[in-house]
């Protein structure tokens, strides 16, 4: 599945064989240097000092008239943060995230978006063997609260400052010259996250794993693992257990 409307808006023009090659992880766009991102995170109240992209790689950035976007593959194979995982994804969750993220976009909710969903032709071992897939997604950024936590928990404060400077330049350049721009960054991130969760609640969306490793600095919805929509209002409903 190739999201041609999104590709057009990003100025991406590829032949069919290039789509299959690049977005399956079998080939790389010119000048691409893939990286897996490192981060920590509070998961359901417990701090985990080392997480990172276990099955995702960032291919690079796309500059458009509307700003800069990350281009990321999910399910393309092992990274240095895979731990005991295989770095792969089953095709079902890939298609599910494709549909959900596009639905959220058209519902007016800030979100990562799906550019392509590719069947790999391989099988991945889960409870049973399932068809494998790779998702290509874009987002304004994959910087997470957990990215800051990784360095802060190690007292690497110069790295925290560098990360904050990058986040300001990328997402909030209008605050660069303010006297307390780091405090203003915190306020902007908190405000955008509050607005995001409010939009979720307005449409009955439950993320299911809203931990700091899934909390973007840009205020976008990412990682559609156990998420669901409420069919009927039930304030105690959960989808993460």
Model-identified regions with their sequence ranges:
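Conserved ATP-binding subdomain of kinase catalytic cores across diverse folds
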Residues: 4-20, 24-180, 191, 195-196, ...
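Catalytic activation segment of kinase domains across protein kinase-like and atypical kinase folds
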Residues: 123, 129, 202-207, 211-241
